[in-house]
Amino acid sequence: LLGFAPATVQIDGPFVSDTRLPWGDEVRFTAVIRNTGADDARLVVDYVVHHRRANGTLSTKVFKLATAALAPGEELAIDRRHSFRAITTRRYYPGEHAIALQVNGVATPSATFELLALADEPV
């Protein structure tokens, strides 16, 4: 991935703060990335949101998170929020959504949560 070689890292997470999220709120997710290799690791870390679409399928959107250089044994703590409030460029649908990390282009397993619809709010 553009000069970033695969790295020997252990990734704990992502973990979401709430498994049920009211529409218009934000989800908080955390993770820890640890360099388990013997050499320094150059990392580019993104997060991937799997959005529910109107037809029930999921579409992905990648967001930049950080670039870092970790010494052997060093950790990078991730603590981020992603908003689900109304915006003009995306429409949100209730149901299961997911967040995953992507380190040097390699995705982690995702953490899921349910976006709830409110009766008086357009979704």
Named regions from a protein language model:
Residues 1-36:
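Surface beta-strand/loop "capping" patches
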Residues 9-13, 53-67:
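Short beta-strand and strand-turn-strand segments in soluble, beta-rich domains
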Residues 26-34, 38-53:
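Beta-strand-rich binding/interaction modules
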Residues 60-87, 115:
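A beta-strand/beta-hairpin structural motif
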Residues 86-96:
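Short glycine/proline/serine/threonine-rich loop/turn segments at secondary-structure transition edges
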Residues 86-88, 102-111:
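Short acidic/polar inter-strand loop motif in beta-rich domains
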Residues 106-123:
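Short beta-strand elements
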